[in-house]
Regions:
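Hydrophobic alpha-helical segments, chiefly the membrane-spanning helices
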Residues: 1-328
Length: 328
């Protein structure tokens, strides 16, 4: 048990370190291309900080563990929205732009609804009963993700100012090396992280789903947490908001899309990524978090996630964790 815990911590450390290198390198490249702060957060940083989730979920899918692959994403998005945004808002309220309210936040809600519909295969409406995300579903998700990335870059190109050029003086070759080194650390660390977490769960007779939506989800979301806290401290709320929205959308469309396509079922298991381990509470909390961000734009202070609303997000997360422990 002690050995597995040490491997788990070492794997997590590599994942977080790798993500840090990847984000720094990607941000340097993005700023040299003249992208706006929000678009950097939404795309490069958002997707970069989701790389741990990609490694963990893809590894789970390749090993035929659907609970790890699916639970990690559902848990990660819940952690991102309720805990990270809630905690970040406590540090400094997050202002929202008109585009955030009209386009970006609704896209997060739509993506979440798509996950529920595709994952449950319309069983909520009495049609179909396999509760899996098939390879075809995964391909559809990846096509939607490609369209989303194209739209984000096309609509978010910003003129590079002298100030931003002076601020980002890092060398391009160093940034590329950081990206490659970060990916290597993420892949190796993620593999060890999944193996040790699964072994610990089985030693303690704890379900893979519980481990996935708590330890794995929280652990792989550490890059998002660190990024958002630093962004809030530096008064870069748009970077923090873009990071979470981009991460959540990327988790669903890119990571679950790739995982569904690559999934190798174990003998006797469904042919697609099974959502049988997910309950209405899990998916309901996931959707609630997406809706709460949108609702906060229309409350008393308007287009701002303030400390009161951040506290509501944190209270919702605490309630969900309590429910998980009660139903362990």
């Amino acid at each position: 048990m002690v050995t597995e815990i040490l491997i788990l911590l070492a794997g997590l450390a590599l994942v977080v370190l790798g993500a840090d290198w990847l984000v720094d390198g990607s941000s340097t490249i993005a700023r040299k291309a003249g992208l706006s702060e929000f678009v950097i957060g939404l795309t490069i940083v958002g997707i970069g900080t989701s790389t741990p989730e990609l490694v963990v979920s893809l590894t789970g899918a390749l090993k035929g563990n659907a609970d790890i692959a699916v639970g990690n994403i559902v848990g990660s998005n819940i952690f991102n929205t309720l805990f990270i945004l809630g905690f970040t808002a406590l540090i400094r309220p997050i202002s929202m732009t008109r585009d955030n309210v009209k386009t970006d936040i609704p896209l997060n809600i739509i993506t979440t609804v798509l996950l529920i519909i595709f994952g449950m295969h319309f069983t909520l409406f009495g049609i179909g009963n396999d509760n899996t995300l098939s390879r075809l579903d995964g391909v559809i998700f990846l096509i939607l993700f490609a369209a989303y990335m194209y739209w984000s870059f096309k609509s978010g190109k910003a003129e590079e100012t002298k100030d931003s050029a002076d601020h980002e003086s890092g060398k391009l070759w160093v940034a590329i090396l950081m990206v490659l080194g970060g990916l290597a650390a993420l892949i190796f660390g993620g593999d060890k992280f999944v193996d040790s977490a699964t072994n610990i769960a089985r030693m303690l007779n704890i379900s893979d789903k519980f481990i996935a939506v708590t330890i794995l989800a929280g652990g792989t979301s550490m890059p998002e947490l660190v990024t958002c806290v630093v962004a809030a401290a530096k008064k870069k709320g748009q970077l923090a908001l873009g990071n979470i929205l981009g991460s959540n959308i990327g988790n669903i469309l890119m990571i679950l899309g790739v995982s569904a396509v690559a999934y190798k079922p174990q003998p006797g298991s469904p042919s697609g990524l099974s959502f049988s381990g997910m309950t209405f509470v899990d998916l309901g909390i996931l959707l609630l978090g997406a809706l709460l961000i949108w609702v906060s734009a229309f409350t008393r202070k308007g287009r701002k996630l303030d400390r009161v609303e951040g506290s509501i997000l944190l209270a919702s997360f605490a309630g969900y964790m309590t429910w998980l422990l009660i139903n362990l």
